[in-house]
């Protein structure tokens, strides 16, 4: 690479980041003089950068004059972990989309509502036309039915009290007894209950205290081949379950 094509770097930003790195290596704190010595920066420059970093919350100054990592860094760390988790989950969804040639959905049941957090589709695998909000169509979608299966009967009853099931297509199931009492299978399928011409399959994602599901949608004409979808869908749901278990949290977009 010739000099003219090298990126323009801002030296003060590089110095500030180096200070953050060194402070992070000293859990008990480190003084400005030691920081200057460790980084090779002039002491006046070190003080100037430290004042700025403290003002912005990236460092904190202790009573004895030592500097420690500030709350802003903790926030960045949490955000980075959440973004990495979302990236890992999305990669799994992309692989599943390519494997099954179907649109992929990740959804949760949170605070009494169905929330679709992620959709991975493409021009050749378009998402279902959400002509009715998924929050009001849990009874008619594999996504919603799988999530509701993770609730108690009382919670399902409460859901349908707030969102009475309505006929969305001639194939929509609206009977409360069946929707509330009938146990859902481990893998849920809806056949044109939400949208004519479209079928959907959903598998539970295992995470404590939060119903989550991974689902696919595809043209109903492919129903005859759905048994080929079962193993990849379950495997992807298990991979996401393991990612969430390691992270210890769900990457909510709220």
Language-model segments: which ranges?
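A structural signal for short hydrophobic beta-strand segments in well-ordered beta-sheet cores
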Residues: 59-60, 106-107, 205
């Amino acid at each position: 690479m010739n000099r003219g094509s090298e990126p323009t770097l801002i030296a003060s930003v590089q110095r500030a980041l180096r200070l953050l790195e060194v402070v992070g290596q000293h859990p008990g704190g480190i003084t400005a003089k030691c920081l200057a010595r460790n980084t090779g920066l002039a002491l006046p420059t070190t003080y100037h950068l430290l004042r700025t970093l403290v003002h912005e919350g990236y460092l904190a100054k202790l009573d004895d004059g030592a500097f420690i990592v500030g709350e802003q860094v903790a926030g960045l760390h949490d955000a980075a972990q959440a973004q990495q988790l979302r990236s890992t989950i999305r990669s799994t969804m992309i692989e599943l989309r390519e494997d099954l040639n179907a649109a992929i959905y990740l959804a949760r049941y949170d605070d009494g509502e169905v929330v679709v957090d992620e959709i991975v589709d493409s021009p050749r695998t378009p998402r279902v036309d959400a002509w009715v909000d998924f929050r009001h169509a849990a009874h008619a979608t594999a996504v919603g039915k799988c999530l509701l299966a993770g609730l108690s009967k009382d919670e399902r009853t409460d859901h349908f009290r707030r969102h009475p099931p309505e006929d969305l297509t001639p194939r929509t199931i609206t009977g409360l007894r069946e929707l509330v009492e009938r146990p859902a299978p481990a893998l849920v399928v809806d056949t044109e209950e939400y949208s004519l011409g479209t079928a959907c399959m959903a598998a539970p994602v295992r995470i404590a205290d939060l119903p989550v599901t991974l689902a696919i949608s595809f043209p109903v004409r492919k129903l005859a081949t759905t048994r080929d979808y079962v193993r990849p869908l379950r495997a992807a749901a298990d991979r996401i379950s393991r990612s969430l278990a390691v992270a210890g949290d769900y990457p909510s977009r709220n």
